[in-house]
């Protein structure tokens, strides 16, 4: 299910397609234990998951789990093994994982991915081609144009907010929309009536939780 491979990209944790995330996390822990003292705390690895898009919402939990085990994920690779040879990877794209706290005081550029298990606050812009994967809510004090996936741990109570919400994609828990907010109007995206709605700050009406 999981294994570490030495490749041209360096050391890669390869996770095959799976059905149960808890089984994957347990398998990662077991594999690292089997490897004894191979890793030092803070070692950086790459991560590749088969059927990346299917499992994208699990990435914050996987990255957080690896961090708790002392490993930092430097980049996420999208691709496949070549000719069944697991040590030869065909990489279609790669995104940099920002090892950061929940408060980011800069722009997030194209090709960068921010992964955090809780809320993420950005004092800057989220450019096209950038991505945020957050366990909680995401608030951008700037223009948001990239992909933002929120509520991956906390569920549909999470929100996505920005001073200018022009995202390519918003995901909150299991809900996805490609809609945008009104240009240059501070807006909040939240789940209401089993779908994501985007409303101006001054007109937002949240659905009451039971």
From Swiss-Prot:
Gene: minC
Example of a GO biological process term: division septum assembly
UniProt entry keywords in alphabetical sequence: Cell cycle, Cell division, Septation
Family membership noted in the UniProt record: Belongs to the MinC family.
Matches recorded under InterPro entries: CAP/MinC_C (IPR016098), MinC (IPR013033), MinC_C_sf (IPR036145), MinC_N (IPR007874), Septum_form_inhib_MinC_C (IPR005526)
NCBIfam families linked to this entry: minC (TIGR01222), PRK13992.1 (NF010598)
Any one Pfam family match given in the protein's UniProt record, by short name: MinC_C
Residue ranges of coiled coil: none
Assembly and oligomerization: Interacts with MinD and FtsZ.
Domain of life: Bacteria
Biological function: Cell division inhibitor that blocks the formation of polar Z ring septums. Rapidly oscillates between the poles of the cell to destabilize FtsZ filaments that have formed before they mature into polar Z rings. Prevents FtsZ polymerization.
Protein name: Probable septum site-determining protein MinC
